[in-house]
Amino acid sequence: MNASDLIRIMQFGDSVLPVGAFTFSNGVESAIQTGIVHDVATLKGFVLTALKQAASCDGMGVVVAHRAVVADDRDGIIRADWAVNNRKLNEESRLMATRMGKKLAEMSIHVVEHPLISWWLEQIKNGNTAGTYPVTQAVVMAAQGIGQREVVVMHQYGVAMTILSAAMRLMRVTHFDTQHILFELNHDIEKFCDIAEIGDINQMSSYVPIVDVLAAVHVKAHVRLFSN
């Protein structure tokens, strides 16, 4: 990998990329409020579950969309996007995916200036597609020539960091703890990337009941710091 590709991966995979990720907790807020997550060990377990679920749903969407971009199959990109959106059972998950996806597309047309990204944002604005974050990420990175494996890794990193960053504001956990968790999950992320690279829409699954239960709890929570 050359330096140019690496720095683009670092830029678009940065946890402070201005796409609104800081407003979401990926479900960990409710998990902490209900006591499911209460220490470093349970936080690590929650992140691991989220990464596995992301690999079998959003991660596969990333791969399918990336392959469609490479094949210049624009209908295939849209099919992948709706497949991701339709598998998000709770409203908060759909809101997170579509809000961040649109923000990424809006930012990227000013940074990358690629016709495919302009087309993609137009489809989102016209309601022709949902504009989920995983598929938008695939479109933006594939347009820059970044490989599918690297984009899946970016997505996995984003899932983990969204949860860990939120956890630091919600529970007694240190920077050292969260970085250690992320480091320890490296080998698991490698396996989850293999799952995502199956790249088959028909095998995409978002079945993690606890996530949807926590989302329902979060909707009715009296105090909320995050949007999900």
Swiss-Prot record:
Keywords: Chaperone, Cytoplasm, Nickel insertion
Coiled coil regions, renumbered to chain: none
Pfam families: UreF (PF01730)
Any one of the GO CC terms: cytoplasm
Domain of life according to the entry: Bacteria
InterPro entries: UreF, UreF_sf
Annotated GO MF terms: nickel cation binding
TM ranges: none
Cell compartments where the protein resides: Cytoplasm
Main location: cytoplasm
PANTHER family (alphabetical): UREASE ACCESSORY PROTEIN F (PTHR33620:SF1)
Family: Belongs to the UreF family.
Function per UniProt: Required for maturation of urease via the functional incorporation of the urease nickel metallocenter.
Subunit note: UreD, UreF and UreG form a complex that acts as a GTP-hydrolysis-dependent molecular chaperone, activating the urease apoprotein by helping to assemble the nickel containing metallocenter of UreC. The UreE protein probably delivers the nickel.
Protein name (record): Urease accessory protein UreF
Species assigned in the record: Yersinia pestis
Lineage: Bacteria, Pseudomonadati, Pseudomonadota, Gammaproteobacteria, Enterobacterales
